[in-house]
From Swiss-Prot:
The lineage of its organism: Bacteria, Pseudomonadati, Pseudomonadota, Gammaproteobacteria, Alteromonadales. Belongs to the UPF0102 family. NCBIfam families: PRK12497.1-3, YraN family protein. SUPFAM superfamilies: Restriction endonuclease-like. InterPro entries: Restrct_endonuc-II-like, tRNA_endonuc-like_dom_sf, UPF0102_YraN-like. GO terms for molecular function: nucleic acid binding. This is UPF0102 protein Sama_3355.
Length: 108
């Protein structure tokens, strides 16, 4: 398993331990990708997982660009439409830098 997959596993386990439920993982469309689709009650939570090594450039929180946010929004909209889901949603980020995990609710 590569470091990105390990980071996604760690993020998923952390979110599940805090009461969220996994709906889908690694959802890919030609115009964007969703790392994790979770649910917290009725709310669909689209999660971007970012991983950086401690010696890497910057930390994981700084790694989500405006263009990536736009692609994730577009992919999430498509996911909701394809699955005929009419529910509130939000966009979270799990940033992992080395051993440190930071969960940012409503990241954008």
């Amino acid at each position: 398993m590569n470091p990105g997959q390990l980071a996604e596993d760690r993020a998923m386990k952390h979110l599940c331990a805090h009461g969220l439920r996994l709906e889908a993982r690694n959802v890919r469309y030609p115009f964007g990708e969703i790392d994790l689709v979770m649910r917290e009650g009725r709310v669909y939570v689209f999660v971007e997982v970012k991983f950086r090594t401690p010696k890497g450039f910057g930390d994981a929180v700084q790694a989500l660009s405006a263009a990536q946010q736009q692609r994730l929004r577009r992919a999430a909209t498509h996911y909701l439409q394809c699955h005929r889901i009419d529910a509130p949603c939000r966009f979270d980020m799990v940033a992992i830098t080395g051993d440190k995990l930071e969960w940012i609710k409503d990241a954008f």
